[in-house]
Amino acid sequence: MRAPSMDRAAVARVGAVASASVCALVAGVVLAQYIFTLKRKTGRKTKIIEMMPEFQKSSVRIKNPTRVEEIICGLIKGGAAKLQIITDFDMTLSRFSYKGKRCPTCHNIIDNCKLVTDECRKKLLQLKEKYYAIEVDPVLTVEEKYPYMVEWYTKSHGLLVQQALPKAKLKEIVAESDVMLKEGYENFFDKLQQHSIPVFIFSAGIGDVLEEVIRQAGVYHPNVKVVSNFMDFDETGVLKGFKGELIHVFNKHDGALRNTEYFNQLKDNSNIILLGDSQGDLRMADGVANVEHILKIGYLNDRVDELLEKYMDSYDIVLVQDESLEVANSILQKIL
């Protein structure tokens, strides 16, 4: 007796199942080959940084991906309990430019305010034009630049003192400025606060202005410590000078060592994410005695062609003309 023949619909269903099975098998083979190839190349099944879309942008430059992968894996393994952030402020947490226009540093916020006379502003601009060129000169060494930075800061601070700026006007000065924090700053600060991660902002700018910027942005959380050049006001609230040792872009090593007590309180926080935008910022973690893993992220904002090689030699990750905190936030997302 002949078995009843299958109707066309049943045949189609069987064919579809068989076809899907073949596709799944082929896809599985392709995936296995991909993983095998990755494993053979890197010694592991996958690379975390290859799976993070933020790392695939053209602005992200990494000289040694294997080293960066190892550091990030160490940071992830250590988790929140071992992490601390050490970061510069001007042009690192704040924007270098927006829609083609330069954004102000903490010093520029004061320089550009309506309380500063036109004559003083002209002198401050002349100082900036002279000394900024020295600061970013790719040929001069840090040691050669050092005395010029002291000259620049000392002269500009002297001019500001002559303006008799009132402390009561700082809030208004910041509110009226064009300062902007980098895209993603809320996520950055809020996530670190939620997980009680210490944030050490080490700035050669003006501390009073810096604090007002992050206060007005709503991100001056209790886990944030600011070390910078703080204004000294007289009993009537008028600027009379600056407190303590001068911090400029190339003496952060000395400043870091002066803050050893702070870092000693965080002796269990042996994993560091460091963010900066200059060669001097690389020394900001010098006060940390027990570093286990440190990831150095550098923003290269200006003179890219001249400085890229030097930055890639010194920073683990270089972000070229990047006005966001996307990369840092993506790493924090993996750790926390």
Swiss-Prot record:
Mutating residue 234 to N leads to what result? Answer: No effect on nucleotidase and phosphotransferase activity
Q: Give the source's domain of life in one word.
A: Eukaryota
Ligand binding (Mg(2+)): 88, 90, 277
Binding site residues for N(7)-methyl-GMP: 135, 156
GO cellular-component term (any): nuclear body
Q: What are the record keywords, sorted?
A: Cytoplasm, Disease variant, Endoplasmic reticulum, Hydrolase, Magnesium, Metal-binding, Nucleotide metabolism, Nucleotide-binding, Phosphoprotein, Transferase
Briefly describe its induction: Isoform 2 is induced by interferon alpha in Raji cells in association with lupus inclusions.
* Hydrolase recorded as keyword: yes
A GO molecular-function descriptor? magnesium ion binding
Q: What is the effect of changing residue 280 to R?
A: In P5ND; greatly reduced catalytic activity
Residues bearing the modification Phosphoserine: 278
Example GO biological process: defense response to virus
Any keyword Endoplasmic reticulum?
yes
Compartments, record wording: Cytoplasm
Q: What is the effect of changing residue 90 to N?
A: Loss of nucleotidase and phosphotransferase activity
Quick one: where is this thing mainly located?
A: cytoplasm
Q: Quote the record's binding site residues for CMP.
A: 135
Tissue distribution of the protein: Isoforms 1, 3 and 4 are expressed in reticulocytes. Isoform 4 is hardly detectable in bone marrow and fetal liver.
- EC number(s): the record gives 3.1.3.5, 3.1.3.91
The disease tied to this protein in UniProt is:
P5N deficiency: Autosomal recessive condition causing hemolytic anemia characterized by marked basophilic stippling and the accumulation of high concentrations of pyrimidine nucleotides within the erythrocyte. It is implicated in the anemia of lead poisoning and is possibly associated with learning difficulties.
Q: Its quaternary structure?
A: Monomer.
Function description = Nucleotidase which shows specific activity towards cytidine monophosphate (CMP) and 7-methylguanosine monophosphate (m(7)GMP). CMP seems to be the preferred substrate.
For this protein, the record's NCBIfam families field holds: HAD-SF-IE
Report the PANTHER family cross-referenced here.
Answer: 5'-NUCLEOTIDASE, CYTOSOLIC 5'-NUCLEOTIDASE 3A
The entry assigns this protein to a family as follows: Belongs to the pyrimidine 5'-nucleotidase family.
Its recorded name reads Cytosolic 5'-nucleotidase 3A
